Amino acid sequence: MTSVVKRIATGSSVLAVLPANEDPVEFPGDYFLQNPGKIRVCINRKLDVATLRQYVYEGLKNGDVHVCHINSYLYQVLKDTRDEAQSDWISFGVSLAVKGGIVSVFDTLMIEDYRGEAPDGRKCDGRTIDDDKWLPMLILGLYRVSRATQEDYKKSLLQKLYAQCKLRSPQAEELVEDAAEFYEVWSNDSNFLKLVAAIDMFFHKFKNHADAGLRWGTIVSRFKDCAALATLSHVQKVTGLSIKEVFTWVLNKSVEDELCRMMKERQEVDKADSYMPYLIDFGISTKSPYSSVKNPCFHFWGQLTALLVHSHRAKNARVPEDIPYNELTTAAWLFAYAMGRSSGLEQRFTTDDSYYQEDEDINKGLGVKAPTTRDVQMWLAWWSDIGKVPTQDMETFARREVLGLTEIRSKTIGEYAKKTFSV
């Protein structure tokens, strides 16, 4: 939309524009309109699993395994993993299974031959089929470890990964050192990411499968770069409101715009067995419309609201840059205060036909007294009556909520709230 202003001195029109410095978001539905069918992945299928097992083992041990061998090994070892579909499985018009049919772990993919050069690996003696019980867990678990950003947490994850491997086979070995980083480059390989996503998508669908424990490593692929969606779900849970009621508490245009974009129809956001949660690793989208980066105002508003209604995890959410902090803070503050001053308590059962019903007029004509319901209209009327300036009780409420915050990280919602409300 173009914006035109008038220059007072001359009466001439001036076009007001900003530089287009951001790439547009890419929705999963648009991808499948342009690329109908299953996700394509390229795998080198020339080597047998016995040779690949040796290459992968020695490569992990020495820190020089080639991702092409990793992909081929995962494919060869897991391709026969199957389960029975309890219903038709369709996503974005792609038929993945029919009710009663047998579906395999990579049936979400269209497997094509890898045409690039595959270097030789290093062979070794003593590798057996028993290694196939734990090596895939180690490989997939390293993907999860590579996503960690804090060193202590990374080391902790690696130890937990080894425990998972030993559960699958007592012969599992700790091949990778704490300081190793060679496996982090696997995330640059689109074929590896697609295999990870396909594995997680399958075991999310078939949660009771004997090998569903492999999700320990792949689970971070699901809803990657969808932090804003997670924020929406979190706000709904911690406030106790329905999703519709949460929407009514959106008071800022910037939040409104971002939320409406996220709610674009026919994207299968609410379909659990869809391709959608894996839009990044499947290569469906390079700019997620559900990330905190693309929805900074909504993410900030939601996380600050959650923090002020006792959410411990919200304190570590990152504070976005270059957003209207003041108006977003006020909106989140009022929302949280309303939740803290009211409740959804009602009599839910009765022994006969009689039960307590609140007088509908109880909150009318309150003047400057805060409402006791969660009705946004009553709260906005009250907010207008008090001059749209936070009351002393609101300040006390916010100060009390941030008083006990400890172990606060830099540039987080916790730090922002502490500085804003503790004065």
UniProtKB/Swiss-Prot annotation:
Per UniProt, the keywords (alphabetical) are:
Capsid protein, Helical capsid protein, Host cytoplasm, Ribonucleoprotein, RNA-binding, Viral nucleoprotein, Virion
- What species was this sequence derived from? Isfahan virus (ISFV)
Kindly list the positions annotated as binding RNA. Answer: 144, 153, 207, 215, 287, 318, 409
On assembly, the entry states: Homomultimerizes to form the nucleocapsid. Binds to viral genomic RNA; this interaction contributes to the virion assembly. N in the nucleocapsid interacts (via C-terminus) with the P protein (via C-terminus); this interaction allows to package the L polymerase in the virion and positions the polymerase on the template, since P acts as a bridge between N and L. N(0) interacts with the P protein; this interaction prevents the uncontrolled aggregation of N(0). Interacts with the matrix protein (inner layer); this interaction contributes to the virion assembly. Interacts with the L polymerase.
Q: Which GO terms describe its cellular component?
A: helical viral capsid; host cell cytoplasm; ribonucleoprotein complex; viral nucleocapsid
| Record-linked SUPFAM superfamilies | Rhabdovirus nucleoprotein-like
Ranges where the record places region Interaction with the phosphoprotein: 351-391
Look up keyword Ribonucleoprotein and say if it applies: yes
User: What would you give as a GO molecular function for this chain, any one?
Assistant: RNA binding
- Location(s), subcellular: Virion; Host cytoplasm
Q: What is its main location?
A: virion
Q: What does this protein do?
A: Encapsidates the genome in a ratio of one N per nine ribonucleotides, protecting it from nucleases. The encapsidated genomic RNA is termed the NC and serves as template for transcription and replication. The nucleocapsid is bullet-shaped with the tip containing 8 turns of a conical spiral before reaching the helical cylindrical trunk. Nucleocapsid assembly is concomitant with replication, therefore viral replication depends on the intracellular concentration of free N, termed N(0). All replicative products are resistant to nucleases.
Q: Which Pfam families match?
A: Rhabdo_ncap
> What's this protein's family per the entry?
Belongs to the vesiculovirus nucleocapsid protein family.
Tell me the protein's name.
Nucleoprotein
